[in-house]
């Protein structure tokens, strides 16, 4: 019952409070959100939404929670982890990081992580523990262990050296931290090891062999060397090729170098390299800086050796001999170094040194070279005289002709020589109206002009300038021939020297040979001056005779048909016309010192060579004459011949009736004399046919053997029937004999043709007997006395 009343009193009290309480207004959640957003937009409230959108958080609270989280995590936290813990956007975290770093100096931002000094102190303690345990730690290993950048870690550890970390940083390699005990231990090892070294040793090999820390080794080694604790030097710096050279070795080395140089007078760079001296050139320069030395490619030579070579060279030059300096030099000296040494020795002589270097080591005086040249003097004269006789057209070059022409113009007045030539020509052929009959014509024109006749006063200068532009195109001797002669003269000379000397002598010998050729031609020209006078007279007479013969031969050809005339024309151009052309060219060649003994030996190429050396005025006429030999017209050839004789100042006597009768008679007699002595059936038939043609037509004929059938056919109605029948029969036998001979030569040694050979032999014997029986009768057709006509006489 009492409990019920207690409950009633409690309810009455609650009701009374409710009656007297004031009423309050409550906002909905939506209204709250709108109000907060309004305040944020008006910048009256600065709060940040959480990622789930259920809460607002102030920037100050974010900073507080970041500091708390950094402390909880031991002084190092990643900002990504902070974003997950605080549950706000990463941008707000990054914005507050800058404020924290500014307000708290002991906090730093490293690789997206907040790190404070407490963490770095604990890290330094851990590093110190490792350092004391191993004696050294490397920053690179610490970077991998703690995932921090090397520069940041080096800076942080450096600040704590001596305070937290009991060690010191290598000054040369700031990536290593040592303890004093470690450095002292290594220093003692390095000192002991290098104190025991007695020869140059590569430092790099010791690092790998004894496990030294490379940078520490170089630092300690340099310190020990600089303080004098170690006697030696480090060559090559802090590189893979660094070498430690102890003083005891250097002293031994220097003693050996001094002794070798004193005894031999030179030093080899390779030998010094084998001694452990890497830069031999600089070593020698420092060692012998007050000693005159000559540095070559692979060696260094002292003044004593240079003086010895120089004395030998001077002796060779003064005595007019040669010397090979290689025996005077050490055998280890290369050919290239010997050549460089000799070049230095020859330099004081300057450009006027009367010596030449062969094979790099052989010095030859100019006097010796001249003596070698004189060995070939006699042979030059012999060869020049022989070549002049054999083929002078190809022996003398155009340049030689210019120079010879200059020499002639110096000794002879141009006008007097021209007048003298005209006088000689007149004496040899008679006056205009005398000697050739009333109808004779004579042609006279200017003498052939030669290049080089102008400017006589400057002949030497022009000669030298031309000689420099055009080399001789003749060869005296080949190199192997010259080498053979030199071996006999200097048997003790090296083979390479002989070869180079021969090559050196080729041009001078060819030049001398050219001078000898000129001299031979000039002497030959001077000795045959009187003979030339007769030559001009004889030439004009011979040209006139051949000219008239060609005219008469042309007249005889007109009795035949066109095809036969063509064959006769070609034959005449190839023989008589070519002979008269060669006479003309040989006449001009005599003025050019290019004449040959027999004009018949002049070929087409030789005529072209002569043409190339003529003046333009003469060349035009002679070129047309040369080209007309390949044409098919005698009239064109004679027209060109008239122009050529006119250009060459050759007077040609044109024949009259009396002259023609004399030529006909002489030609007939010449053919008859030849017919009397010959026994060749083919030639008998040929000569008889031509003579019968002349008897019947009173015209000369110059025909080849293949035109004999046409001549016999022409004579059918010109001679008695019995004579023509005999001639035709003889012709058949001649043809039969020729066919038989051709068959015999064509069969050769064929065994299957024995029977045919026997039969052919019988036929040939029969034919030969018949020809022998008829030959006398055929000759009698023209040789037997007969009545002569008036025109034949």
Swiss-Prot record:
Ubiquitously expressed with expression detected in brain, skeletal muscle, lung, heart, gall bladder, liver, small intestine, pancreas, spleen and kidney (at protein level). At 8 weeks after birth, high expression in the Purkinje cell layer of the cerebellum. GO terms for biological process: DNA damage checkpoint signaling; DNA damage response; DNA repair; erythrocyte differentiation; hematopoietic stem cell differentiation; negative regulation of apoptotic process; negative regulation of IRE1-mediated unfolded protein response; negative regulation of NF-kappaB transcription factor activity. Residues 2-200 are annotated as: Mediates interaction with DDRGK1. InterPro entries: Ufl1, Ufl1-like_C, Ufl1_dom, Ufl1_N. Residues 410-473, 742-769 are annotated as: Disordered. It comes from the Eukaryota. GO terms for cellular component: cytoplasm; cytosol; endoplasmic reticulum; endoplasmic reticulum membrane; mitochondrial outer membrane; neuron projection; nucleus; protein-containing complex. Residues 2-212 are annotated as: Required for E3 UFM1-protein ligase activity. Its main location: endoplasmic reticulum. The modification Phosphoserine is found at residues 458, 462, 752-753. Keywords: Acetylation, Chromosome, Cytoplasm, DNA damage, DNA repair, Endoplasmic reticulum, Membrane, Methylation, Nucleus, Phosphoprotein, Transferase, Ubl conjugation, Ubl conjugation pathway. Residues 200-400 are annotated as: Mediates interaction with TRIP4. Residues 490-683 are annotated as: Mediates interaction with CDK5RAP3. One of its GO terms (molecular function) is protein kinase binding. Residues 121-250 are annotated as: Involved in CDK5RAP3-binding. Residues 758-769 have a biased composition (Basic and acidic residues). Ubiquitinated, leading to its degradation by the proteasome. Interaction with CDK5RAP3 protects both proteins against ubiquitination and degradation via the proteasome. It is an enzyme of class 2 (transferase). The modification Phosphothreonine is found at residue 535. It is found in: Endoplasmic reticulum membrane; Cytoplasm, Cytosol; Nucleus; Chromosome. The modification N-acetylalanine is found at residue 2. Its EC number is 2.3.2.-. E3 protein ligase that mediates ufmylation, the covalent attachment of the ubiquitin-like modifier UFM1 to lysine residues on target proteins, and which plays a key role in various processes, such as ribosome recycling, response to DNA damage, interferon response or reticulophagy (also called ER-phagy). Catalyzes ufmylation of many protein, such as CD274/PD-L1, CDK5RAP3, CYB5R3, DDRGK1, EIF6, histone H4, MRE11, P4HB, PDCD1/PD-1, TRIP4, RPN1, RPS20/uS10, RPL10/uL16, RPL26/uL24, SYVN1/HRD1 and TP53/p53. Belongs to the UFL1 family. Catalytic component of the UFM1 ribosome E3 ligase (UREL) complex, composed of UFL1, DDRGK1 and CDK5RAP3. Interacts with E2-like enzyme UFC1. Interacts with RELA. Interacts with NBN; promoting recruitment to double-strand breaks following DNA damage. Interacts (when phosphorylated) with YWHAG/14-3-3-gamma; sequestering UFL1 and preventing its association with PDCD1/PD-1 substrate. This is E3 UFM1-protein ligase 1. The gene is Ufl1.
């Amino acid at each position: 019952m009492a409990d019920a009343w207690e409950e009633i009193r409690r309810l009455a009290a609650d009701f009374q409070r409710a009656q007297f309480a004031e009423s309050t207004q409550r906002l909905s959640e939506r209204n709250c959100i709108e109000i907060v957003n309004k305040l944020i937009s008006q910048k009256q409230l600065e709060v940040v939404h959480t990622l789930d959108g259920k809460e607002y958080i102030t920037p100050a609270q974010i900073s507080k929670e970041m500091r708390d989280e950094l402390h909880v995590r031991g002084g190092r936290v990643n900002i990504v982890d902070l974003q997950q813990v605080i549950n706000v956007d990463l941008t707000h975290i990054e914005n507050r990081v800058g404020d924290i770093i500014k307000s708290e100096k002991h906090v730093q931002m490293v690789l997206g992580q907040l790190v404070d000094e407490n963490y770095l102190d604990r890290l330094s303690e851990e590093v110190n523990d490792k350092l004391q345990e191993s004696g050294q730690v490397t920053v690179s290993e610490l970077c991998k262990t703690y995932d921090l950048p090397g520069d940041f870690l080096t800076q942080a550890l450096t600040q704590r050296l001596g305070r937290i970390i009991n060690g010191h940083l290598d000054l040369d390699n700031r990536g290593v931290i040592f303890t004093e005990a470690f450095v002292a231990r290594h220093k003692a090892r390095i000192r002991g090891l290098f104190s025991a070294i007695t020869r140059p040793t590569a430092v790099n090999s010791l690092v790998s062999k004894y496990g030294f820390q490379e940078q520490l080794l170089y630092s300690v080694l340099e310190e020990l060397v600089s303080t004098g604790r170690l006697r030696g030097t480090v060559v090559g710096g802090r590189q893979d090729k660094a070498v430690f050279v102890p003083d005891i070795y250097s002293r031994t080395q220097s003693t050996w170098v001094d002794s070798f140089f004193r005894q031999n007078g030179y030093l080899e760079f390779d030998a010094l390299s084998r001694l452990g001296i890497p830069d031999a050139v600089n070593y020698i320069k420092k060692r012998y800086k007050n000693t005159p030395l000559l540095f070559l490619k692979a060696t260094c030579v002292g003044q004593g050796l240079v003086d010895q070579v120089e004395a030998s060279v001077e002796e060779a030059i003064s005595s007019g001999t040669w010397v090979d300096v290689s025996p005077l030099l050490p055998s280890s000296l290369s050919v290239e170094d010997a050549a460089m040494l000799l070049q230095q020795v020859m330099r004081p002589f300057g450009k006027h040194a009367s010596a030449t270097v062969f094979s790099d080591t052989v010095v030859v005086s100019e006097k010796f070279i001249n003596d070698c040249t004189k060995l070939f003097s006699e042979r030059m004269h012999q060869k020049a005289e022989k070549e002049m006789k054999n083929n002078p057209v190809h022996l003398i070059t155009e340049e030689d002709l210019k120079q010879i022409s200059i020499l002639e113009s110096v000794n002879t007045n141009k006008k007097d020589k021209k007048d003298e030539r005209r006088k000689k020509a007149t004496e040899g052929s008679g006056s205009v109206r005398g000697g050739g009959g009333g109808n004779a014509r004579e042609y006279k024109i200017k003498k052939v002009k030669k290049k080089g006749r102008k400017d006589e006063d400057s002949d030497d200068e022009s000669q030298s300038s031309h000689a420099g532009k055009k080399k001789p195109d003749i060869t005296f001797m080949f190199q192997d021939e010259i080498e053979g002669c030199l071996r006999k003269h200097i048997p003790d000379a090296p083979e390479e020297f002989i070869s180079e000397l021969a090559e050196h002598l080729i041009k001078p010998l060819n030049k001398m040979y050219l001078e000898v050729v000129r001299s031979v031609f000039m002497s030959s020209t001077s000795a045959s001056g009187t003979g030339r006078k007769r030559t001009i007279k004889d030439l004009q007479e011979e040209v006139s005779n051949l000219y008239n013969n060609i005219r008469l031969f042309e007249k005889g050809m007109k009795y035949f048909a066109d095809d036969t005339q063509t064959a006769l024309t070609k034959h005449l151009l190839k023989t008589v016309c070519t002979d008269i052309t060669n006479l003309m060219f040989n006449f001009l060649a005599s003025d050019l010192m290019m004449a040959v003994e027999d004009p018949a030996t002049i070929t087409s190429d030789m005529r072209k060579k002569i043409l190339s050396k003529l003046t333009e005025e003469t060349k035009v006429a002679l070129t047309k004459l040369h080209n007309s030999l390949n044409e098919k017209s005698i009239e064109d050839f004679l027209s060109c011949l008239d122009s050529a004789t006119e250009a060459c100042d050759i007077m040609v006597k044109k024949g009259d009736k009396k002259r023609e009768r004399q030529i006909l008679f002489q030609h007939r007699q010449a053919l008859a004399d030849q017919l009397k002595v010959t026994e060749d059936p083919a030639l008998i038939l040929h000569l008889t046919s031509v003579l019968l043609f002349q008897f019947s037509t009173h015209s000369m004929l110059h025909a080849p053997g293949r035109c004999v059938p046409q001549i016999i056919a022409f004579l059918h109605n010109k001679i008695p029937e019995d004579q023509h029948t005999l001639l035709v029969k003889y012709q058949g036998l001649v043809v039969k004999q020729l066919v038989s001979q051709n068959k015999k030569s064509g069969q050769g040694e064929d065994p299957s043709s024995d029977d045919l050979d026997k039969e052919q032999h019988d036929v040939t014997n029969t034919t030969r007997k018949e020809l022998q029986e008829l030959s006398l009768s055929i000759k009698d057709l023209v040789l037997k006395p007969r009545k002569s006509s008036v025109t034949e006489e």
